[in-house]
Each structure stands twice: as structure tokens, then as C-alpha cells.
Amino acid sequence: MGVTLDDARAIVAPLPRSYEAVVRDSVRFRVGRIVYAAFYEDETVMGFAFPREEREALVASEPDKFLLPRASDMRFRWVCVRLDAIDVVELRELLVDAWRMCVPKKVAAAYEG
């Protein structure tokens, strides 16, 4: 098990309005100016958009896999995942769900992935 940045790139490439940006040596995936996923510099952890009110429960349910973002990012709708703890199927689910949070509902509804 375990996924890479290249796995993520392949997943997000077909997502409408999605693009990659490098900010402070960190790869981020965006829709417009909104970041929906970001890889930490060492590429072992990925932060992704996730409903703020659900993140504590997610982290508590699988603490070896998910973790809360650093204190400076707690104000965002964000949670983190250890990349060595997931497979490509789960990565796809996390990325597509995060992307859906950031695009207009019509765009999300039109996506068949």
C-alpha cells in the first residue's frame, strides 16, 4: 500500500477546472484560487479539503491514517492523510470528494468519475 504524488497527478488531471501549482516548494491542486489538496514538502502527507465538522470523527476513527492539520491550518476545511496508509482507490475518493467541495455544483454533477 502507499501512493505517490504522481498517482495524485493522474487522478486530478481529468478533473474540470483543476490545476497544479507549486507554492513554497509544496505541490498543491487548485480550483481557481482554492486549494483542495496539498502535498507536504517530503511528500509523505497530503492535506485535503474535508468538512470541518466531520474531521475530528474521521481522525478518531483511523488515527494511524488521518491526522488533524497543523495549528495554523485548523481554520480551514482541511484534514491530512499519511500517504503510506492508503491505496490508489482511497486516494481517488479523497481527491475527487475534495475537488467536489470546491467546484460549482453543476461542474461536480457533470463529472462522471
Q: Language-model segments: which ranges?
A:
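Charge-dense, helix-prone N-terminal extensions
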Residues: 1-113
